[in-house]
């Protein structure tokens, strides 16, 4: 694989890659070294106005393109993403820190997502409703909602853009994304594939800059008709409130803190392999990452020992280095957060079984950590750690574990391990989550719904349900005269 040199990132406005009107830029830092590797354009109001005007004109053009032609263009983009997967993955690892193997999987998965949405967009149908008056015709028509404003996080720079972008394009909407300024190059490479595939100017736009300034300007703007956001629950609530104030549709994919219930009859080796792998993927910086491990007391010690062994078997290092299985945390803020989690765990009497400390002084490396005997009042059992920390607590009855899993206001994802169909039935009925994986790691395929309940948001970014928020349903009745 040829090495890819990291370059500066520009804005995408009206089909052109441009600097900010002010010339302002922001440093991009490699989390594995702590050193700047490039710069990204910092959009101001003048840039946003240009991007909004382009999104409006792009929408008027794109909505007129037949669904099968939109799908063909999207498939061309998917093919280009696959061709460029190695290069895009290297950009991602340099700016985000995850191992190159994980970055490449993310990019290749993006191509699958594009193709699935391209095909699903061809199946957006209206319907004919039998009239009560035989002289009338009643039809239901689906139309694109309009220009979309998207706001995406740094933990999955490509995946979190492509889900929103694909749903928007498949339904005939234009799309303007404020992507993360900490990880700008890989989202730009994704959008470049769409430009090169022939998506018309203005249909897609890309800006970076101050999150509060950009969101407070885009969401109320009359051009924008749909808002979609992935990020923390507190910020999501603010953006959802702003969208509601201006009657904009919104999809919110927010914080998780996923429970993992390991029942008495579980296959411990399977549970450790599946949940452990999911826990330390992307250094735990995953909204659906398993975080609260609720393990039956009869197997708790066995499970803890096995998870510690799994964690200690990970190779921590620069994501570009061969064999690395756990990369740097994305930014210094995560190091501070991890230190706080560990300090609190010790203070309340939990046991640090492995890890619990920063590795080295260069880069944002933190040891994979397992905490046992965690009290319910520990921070790690109440606030999403968003890092490589697994917290374990025992239980005696499955109903107790379910109650604890549901105790928090979050409800994005959940995991369970059991051989009993009765347990599966109970877990399926009782766990308050939008996504549940039993006896396996997370598999968020594009054809399955992806979203949460309670404070974890609303709306879906997968399955046929993902297209509905981008569509307007129009009722048309015509009387023959």
From Swiss-Prot:
<feature type="binding site">
    <location>
        <begin position="178"/>
        <end position="181"/>
    </location>
    <ligand>
        <name>NADP(+)</name>
    </ligand>
</feature>
<dbReference type="InterPro" id="IPR016163">
    <property type="entry name" value="Ald_DH_C"/>
</dbReference>
<dbReference type="InterPro" id="IPR016161">
    <property type="entry name" value="Ald_DH/histidinol_DH"/>
</dbReference>
<dbReference type="Pfam" id="PF00171">
    <property type="entry name" value="Aldedh"/>
</dbReference>
<feature type="binding site">
    <location>
        <position position="254"/>
    </location>
    <ligand>
        <name>NADP(+)</name>
    </ligand>
</feature>
<feature type="binding site">
    <location>
        <begin position="231"/>
        <end position="232"/>
    </location>
    <ligand>
        <name>NADP(+)</name>
    </ligand>
</feature>
<keyword id="KW-0119">Carbohydrate metabolism</keyword>
<feature type="binding site">
    <location>
        <position position="384"/>
    </location>
    <ligand>
        <name>NADP(+)</name>
    </ligand>
</feature>
<protein>
    <recommendedName>
        <fullName>Alpha-ketoglutaric semialdehyde dehydrogenase 1</fullName>
        <ecNumber>1.2.1.26</ecNumber>
        <ecNumber>1.2.1.24</ecNumber>
    </recommendedName>
</protein>
<dbReference type="GO" id="GO:0004777">
    <property type="term" value="F:succinate-semialdehyde dehydrogenase (NAD+) activity"/>
</dbReference>
<keyword id="KW-0560">Oxidoreductase</keyword>
<keyword id="KW-0521">NADP</keyword>
<comment type="similarity">
    <text>Belongs to the aldehyde dehydrogenase family.</text>
</comment>
<feature type="active site" description="Proton acceptor">
    <location>
        <position position="253"/>
    </location>
</feature>
<feature type="binding site">
    <location>
        <begin position="154"/>
        <end position="155"/>
    </location>
    <ligand>
        <name>NADP(+)</name>
    </ligand>
</feature>
<dbReference type="GO" id="GO:0009450">
    <property type="term" value="P:gamma-aminobutyric acid catabolic process"/>
</dbReference>
<dbReference type="GO" id="GO:0047533">
    <property type="term" value="F:2,5-dioxovalerate dehydrogenase (NADP+) activity"/>
</dbReference>
<comment type="function">
    <text>Catalyzes the NAD(P)(+)-dependent oxidation of alpha-ketoglutaric semialdehyde (alphaKGSA) to alpha-ketoglutarate. Is involved in a degradation pathway of L-arabinose that allows A.brasilense to grow on L-arabinose as a sole carbon source. Prefers NAD(+) to NADP(+) as a cosubstrate. Displays broad substrate specificity: exhibits the highest activity with alphaKGSA and succinic semialdehyde as substrates, but to a lesser extent, is also active with glutaraldehyde, benzaldehyde, and a number of aldehydes from C3 to C8.</text>
</comment>
<dbReference type="InterPro" id="IPR016162">
    <property type="entry name" value="Ald_DH_N"/>
</dbReference>
<keyword id="KW-0520">NAD</keyword>
<dbReference type="GO" id="GO:0070403">
    <property type="term" value="F:NAD+ binding"/>
</dbReference>
<dbReference type="InterPro" id="IPR050740">
    <property type="entry name" value="Aldehyde_DH_Superfamily"/>
</dbReference>
<dbReference type="GO" id="GO:0019570">
    <property type="term" value="P:L-arabinose catabolic process to 2-oxoglutarate"/>
</dbReference>
<dbReference type="GO" id="GO:0070401">
    <property type="term" value="F:NADP+ binding"/>
</dbReference>
<keyword id="KW-0054">Arabinose catabolism</keyword>
<dbReference type="InterPro" id="IPR015590">
    <property type="entry name" value="Aldehyde_DH_dom"/>
</dbReference>
<dbReference type="GO" id="GO:0051262">
    <property type="term" value="P:protein tetramerization"/>
</dbReference>
<feature type="active site" description="Nucleophile">
    <location>
        <position position="287"/>
    </location>
</feature>
<comment type="subunit">
    <text>Homotetramer.</text>
</comment>
